[in-house]
C-alpha cells in the first residue's frame, strides 16, 4: 500500500522523515544457544591516546565484526579549552529502527588541539559501539588527565592516517541516530539537485503558482523592458530570496545538535504531527491559513517602499519574500530545515537551502522573460491539487509517529490514509476536465488503491482473535536496581514461577528487534505467560543501571537471563544478541519444562 502512496509523499518525506537507515538490520541473525561469544568492550574497541604538547590524539582500534557509532562520540573538557576537532566522517549505515547514522569499522583517529591549560585539566571522552551480529555495549566514558603545555597554534592537526576526507567541525558535533536523511545524503553530490527539484515542485503548488504573474509585474515595475533586463531583474529577485533561505539554513545547521536531540523526543514528534495535521486541514478548506494582518501590513509596507524595476529594490523584495511561507510550502520547508539540522554541516545547510530557493524561482524567471503563456491556466484542477497536498501533509505525521506507536496503530493509520486518499480520487474522477480512457484509468487506479489500502487492516481484522490477545498480553515488570530485582525474584520463588529478565535500552537495535519480531510472536507470547517477565531499562546508563549490569555481569545488550521456579539462575541459559521467534520459543520451552 505504501508503494501506491509513494508518488504522493516522496518529495516531502525524503526531507521530513529521517528515513530508516544505518546500524544494520540484524533480524536474520540468530543464536541457537545461550553462549556469550562477544568480547569485552576493551577488546572490541581498544582505546589509546597520546599527548604531544598542546595536541592530543585519540585512537580506537575497532575489532573486525564490530563498529563504533559516530553520533555517540562526544568530547568535553575541564580546565582546558578544546580547539577545532578533526576526524574523518563515518560510513553510512542503515537500520529500520533508528534511521540513518554513521559508523566506524576501521581504526579511528581523532586529533584535538588544546589551549589555556589550568591545573586539574581533564578531557572527557564518551563513545559507544556494537557488534554486527546484534549485540550493543553500554556507553563508555574515559577521563584523561591533561599534562601542562605551552599554548601554541590552534589549527587542526594533520590526521595520522588518511582513509577518507576529514570532517571539520568547530565543536564536536557527531550526527544523531535519527535520522532520516542527513547521513545518507550529505556526502552525495546530487543533494543540491534534489533540493533544486523540490523547489521547482513547490513553485507549482496552488498557493504559489497563481502569484507569479502578480509578482512578476511587481518585480519588473512599470514600463516595457527588454528580455535581457527582465531576466536580470528576475535573477536579482531570486537571489534575494535565496539569500534569506541560505541564511536560515546556516542558522539551523549551526544549531544542529540541539535540533537533533529535540527531534528524538516523543513530545516533539507528537507536536510536529499535530502541526502537519493542522496544515493539512487548511488544504482541505477547513480554515484559511495566513499571516496575522499586522504582519501582512508590515511586510506589504516594507515591500512597497522598494522600487520595482531597480536592482536594489528588487533584491530587497526577494529577501523579504523569503520570510513568508505559504500553506503549501511550510511543511516542505520544515522538512528541509529538519534535514539541515540533522546534517549539522554549515556548507550542506547553506547550499541545500540556496538550491531550494533557486528551484522556486525558476518559474518566476520564465514568466518574467517569456510571459504568462508558459503557465497553465487556472481552474478547478488547482483546488484538487490543493486537496492532494492535504493528503501529502497527512502522510508526514504517520511517518513521524511510526517511531513511537505500536505497529498495529501505524498500520491502521496508513490504511485509513490510503482509503481516504483513493476514495477521494474515485469521487472526483467524474469532475475531471478530461474524459474517455484517461478518466477510466483514474477510476481503475482509485479502485486498486482502495483495495491495496484496505488490505493491511483486513489482514488484522481477520487474524485469529486469540492470537491478537496473546500478542497484546506480553508485558514486563520494570525494575530499576539490584534491590528491586531481588524483591521480584523472591516473589517469583514464592509463586513457584520461572523468571526472565530482559536488559533493554533505547540505543540497542537488537532489543527493539526482540520486542517487534520475537516477544510479540503469538506462540512466544503464549509460552511467556508461564514466566515472571522483568525488564531493566538501562538507557540512561545511570549509577544504579551500571550497578545492576555489573551485578549480573552483563557486557552489553541485548542480554536475557533466566531463573527457574526455585529461584536459581539457569546455567547456560543466558541469551546475548538477537534470536528469532522459533529458536527463542524452543529455548524458553526447555527452561519452563
UniProtKB/Swiss-Prot annotation:
Gene3D superfamilies the UniProt entry points to: Glutaredoxin, Thiol:disulfide interchange protein DsbD, N-terminal domain
Q: Where is the signal peptide?
A: 1-21
Q: Matching Pfam families, A to Z? A: DsbD_N, DsbD_TM, Thioredoxin_7
Q: Does the record carry Disulfide bond as a key word?
A: yes
| Major site of localization recorded for this protein | membrane
Report the GO terms under cellular component. Answer: plasma membrane
List the disulfide bonds in this chain.
Answer: 130-136, 207-328, 508-511
Q: Catalysed reaction per UniProt? A: [protein]-dithiol + NAD(+) = [protein]-disulfide + NADH + H(+); [protein]-dithiol + NADP(+) = [protein]-disulfide + NADPH + H(+)
- Keywords assigned: Cell inner membrane, Cell membrane, Cytochrome c-type biogenesis, Disulfide bond, Electron transport, Membrane, NAD, Oxidoreductase, Redox-active center, Signal, Transmembrane, Transmembrane helix, Transport
Please provide, alphabetically and separated by semicolons, the GO molecular function terms listed in this UniProt record: electron transfer activity; protein-disulfide reductase [NAD(P)H] activity
Task: Name the NCBIfam families for this protein.
Answer: PRK00293.1 (NF001419)
Give the similarity note. Belongs to the thioredoxin family. DsbD subfamily.
Mind telling me what this protein is named?
Thiol:disulfide interchange protein DsbD
Amino acid at each position: 500500500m505504501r508503494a501506491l502512496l509513494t508518488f504522493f509523499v516522496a518529495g516531502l518525506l525524503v526531507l521530513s522523515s529521517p528515513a530508516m537507515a544505518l546500524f544494520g538490520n540484524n533480524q536474520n541473525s540468530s543464536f541457537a544457544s545461550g553462549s556469550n561469544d562477544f568480547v569485552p568492550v576493551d577488546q572490541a574497541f581498544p582505546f589509546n591516546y597520546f599527548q604531544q604538547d598542546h595536541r592530543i590524539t585519540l585512537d580506537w582500534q575497532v575489532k573486525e565484526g564490530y563498529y563504533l557509532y559516530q553520533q555517540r562520540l562526544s568530547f568535553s573538557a575541564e580546565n582546558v579549552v578544546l580547539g577545532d576537532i578533526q576526524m574523518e566522517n563515518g560510513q553510512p549505515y542503515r537500520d529500520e529502527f533508528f534511521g540513518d547514522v554513521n559508523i566506524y569499522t576501521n581504526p579511528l583517529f581523532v586529533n584535538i588541539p588544546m589551549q589555556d591549560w589550568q591545573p586539574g585539566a581533564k578531557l572527557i571522552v564518551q563513545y559507544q559501539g556494537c557488534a554486527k551480529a546484534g549485540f550493543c555495549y553500554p556507553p563508555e566514558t574515559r577521563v584523561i588527565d591533561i599534562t601542562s603545555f605551552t599554548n601554541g597554534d590552534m589549527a587542526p592537526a594533520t590526521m595520522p592516517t588518511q582513509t577518507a576526507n576529514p570532517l571539520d567541525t568547530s565543536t564536536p558535533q557527531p550526527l544523531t541516530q535519527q535520522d532520516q536523511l542527513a547521513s545518507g545524503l550529505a556526502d552525495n553530490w546530487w543533494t543540491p539537485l534534489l533540493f533544486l527539484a523540490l523547489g521547482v515542485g513547490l513553485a507549482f503548488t496552488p498557493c504559489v503558482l497563481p502569484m507569479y504573474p502578480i509578482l512578476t509585474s511587481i518585480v519588473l515595475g512599470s514600463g516595457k523592458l527588454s528580455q535581457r533586463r527582465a531576466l536580470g531583474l528576475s535573477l536579482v529577485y531570486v537571489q534575494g530570496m535565496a539569500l534569506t533561505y541560505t541564511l536560515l539554513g546556516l542558522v539551523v545547521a549551526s544549531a544542529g545538535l540541539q535540533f537533533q536531540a529535540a527531534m528524538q523526543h516523543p513530545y516533539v514528534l507528537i507536536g510536529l504531527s499535530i502541526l502537519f495535521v493542522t496544515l493539512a486541514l487548511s488544504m482541505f478548506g477547513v480554515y484559511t491559513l495566513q499571516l496575522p494582518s499586522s504582519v501582512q501590513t508590515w511586510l506589504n509596507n516594507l515591500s512597497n517602499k522598494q522600487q520595482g524595476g531597480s536592482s536594489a529594490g528588487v533584491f530587497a523584495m526577494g529577501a523579504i519574500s523569503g520570510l513568508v511561507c505559504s500553506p503549501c510550502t511550510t511543511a516542505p520547508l520544515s522538512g528541509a530545515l529538519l534535514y539541515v539540522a540533522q546534517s549539522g554541516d554549515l556548507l550542506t545547510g547553506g547550499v541545500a537551502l540556496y538550491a531550494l530557493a533557486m528551484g522556486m524561482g525558476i518559474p518566476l524567471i520564465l514568466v518574467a522573460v517569456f510571459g504568462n503563456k508558459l503557465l497553465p491556466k487556472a481552474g478547478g484542477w488547482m483546488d484538487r491539487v490543493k486537496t492532494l497536498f492535504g493528503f501529502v501533509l497527512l502522510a508526514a505525521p504517520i511517518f513521524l509517529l511510526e517511531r513511537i506507536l505500536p505497529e498495529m496503530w501505524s498500520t491502521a493509520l496508513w490504511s485509513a490514509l490510503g482509503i481516504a486518499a483513493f476514495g477521494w480520487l474515485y469521487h472526483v474522477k467524474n469532475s475531471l476536465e478530461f474524459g474517455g480512457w484517461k478518466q477510466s484509468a483514474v477510476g481503475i487506479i482509485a479502485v486498486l488503491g482502495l483495495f491495496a489500502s484496505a488490505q493491511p487492516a483486513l489482514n488484522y481484522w481477520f487474524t485469529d482473535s486469540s492470537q491478537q490477545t496473546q500478542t497484546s498480553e506480553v508485558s514486563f515488570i520494570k525494575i530499576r536496581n539490584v534491590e528491586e530485582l531481588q524483591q521480584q525474584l523472591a516473589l517469583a520463588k514464592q509463586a513457584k514461577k520461572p523468571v526472565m529478565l530482559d536488559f533493554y535500552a533505547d540505543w540497542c537495535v537488537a532489543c527493539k528487534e526482540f520486542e517487534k519480531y520475537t516477544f510479540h510472536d503469538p506462540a512466544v507470547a503464549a509460552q511467556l505467560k508461564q514466566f515472571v517477565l522483568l525488564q531493566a531499562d538501562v538507557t540512561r546508563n545511570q549509577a544504579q543501571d551500571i550497578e545492576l549490569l555489573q551485578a549480573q555481569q552483563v557486557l552489553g545488550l541485548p542480554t536475557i537471563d533466566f531463573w527457574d521456579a526455585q529461584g536459581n539462575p539457569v546455567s547456560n541459559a543466558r541469551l546475548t544478541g538477537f534470536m528469532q521467534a522459533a529458536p527463542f520459543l524452543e529455548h524458553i520451552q526447555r527452561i519452563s519444562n
